[in-house]
Amino acid sequence: MTQHFIVIGNPIAHSKSPEIHTLFGTQAGLDICYQRQYCPDDAASFTAVIEAFFHGGGVGANVTVPFKQIAYECCAARGGLSEHAKVAGAVNTLLLNKALLAKGVPPVEALFGDNTDGQGLVNHMQRLGWPLNGARVAIIGAGGAARGVVLPLIEAGIETLSIANRTVSKAEILVDELSTASEKINQHTIQTYATADLSGDFDIIINATSIGLSGETLPLTDKLNCQYAYDMMYGRELPFLQHFSIRGAQTSDGYGMLIGQAALSFERWTGRAIDVAQATTALENVST
């Protein structure tokens, strides 16, 4: 029997998720149908699309911009949230709470939300061989992308964490909110800086902003150094990575994170683990 999945967003035509998950299905030996689903940008439309999909037998859905917070609110009022979703304040993976289904709760009232973005980032760094345990890490950006990766990084054993943002007050607010949301984070001291004031030696620096996609550059000082630089964006030459590459750092964009978070979603839905390295090679061969 074919298992049905969707990715919901606006815009959505650019999404690589159908190709990625179709490959996962082939690797796992499962008959799946994964489609893009456009949705008008409002909560009522999102709820209607989700309810129709799961009422019709859908197995799982991915959620992308601008609906991750709406999905969070929807699941919080229904089937629940994972710890990572609670801390991130956003949901990128929808599935059904089997315990509630077993009690006779209708599928649309058993929606459960997870967030696999941060773990996808951590898993990609681990596949690259980047040392996270004991690492000194800095994140540039204090928006939703940064929020979603803090807990997985701490769970991976990093030693210190600094968060920098053009407006330092936004970084301070983020740290306060994260510390309130998670005892694991509350036990970890996080330093905050204005991006232009971030300096010193770090093992890993992560760009969690989209500035590079617009051709802008971050106000990085020459006194800021790292061994590894990671940009969560992908798909073009990124000034952030160029800045650190010429200074001798190993660099990576976020394409591996995209595949990693997708693999985790697929495993949540189907119970099948994906060989991400094999899948990445296959996808790279298809795109070249």
Swiss-Prot record:
Where on the tree of life does the source sit, at the highest rank? Bacteria
One Pfam family linked to the record: Shikimate_dh_N
**Which residues constitute the catalytic centre?**
K68
Q: Which GO terms describe its cellular component?
A: cytosol
- Involved pathway(s): Metabolic intermediate biosynthesis; chorismate biosynthesis; chorismate from D-erythrose 4-phosphate and phosphoenolpyruvate: step 4/7
| Reaction(s) the record says it catalyses | shikimate + NADP(+) = 3-dehydroshikimate + NADPH + H(+)
Could you provide one GO biological process annotation from this protein's UniProt record? Answer: chorismate biosynthetic process
Q: Which UniProt keywords apply?
A: Amino-acid biosynthesis, Aromatic amino acid biosynthesis, NADP, Oxidoreductase
**Where along this sequence does the record place binding of shikimate?**
S15, K16, S17, T64, N92, D117, Y234
What EC number(s) has UniProt assigned to this enzyme? 1.1.1.25
GO molecular function (one): NADP binding
Q: What class does this enzyme belong to in the EC scheme?
A: oxidoreductase
Positions with a binding annotation for NADP(+): E83, G141, A142, G143, G144, A145, N165, R166, T167, V168, S169, K170, M232, G254
Sum up the protein's function in the record's words. Involved in the biosynthesis of the chorismate, which leads to the biosynthesis of aromatic amino acids. Catalyzes the reversible NADPH linked reduction of 3-dehydroshikimate (DHSA) to yield shikimate (SA).
Q: Which family does it belong to?
A: Belongs to the shikimate dehydrogenase family.
The cross-references to PANTHER family, in alphabetical order and at most eight, read: BIFUNCTIONAL 3-DEHYDROQUINATE DEHYDRATASE_SHIKIMATE DEHYDROGENASE, CHLOROPLASTIC (PTHR21089:SF1), SHIKIMATE DEHYDROGENASE (PTHR21089)
Instruction: Please describe the quaternary structure of this protein.
Output: Homodimer.
The identity of this protein, by name, is Shikimate dehydrogenase (NADP(+))
Question: Which source organism?
Answer: Psychrobacter cryohalolentis (strain ATCC BAA-1226 / DSM 17306 / VKM B-2378 / K5)
Taxonomic placement? Bacteria, Pseudomonadati, Pseudomonadota, Gammaproteobacteria, Moraxellales
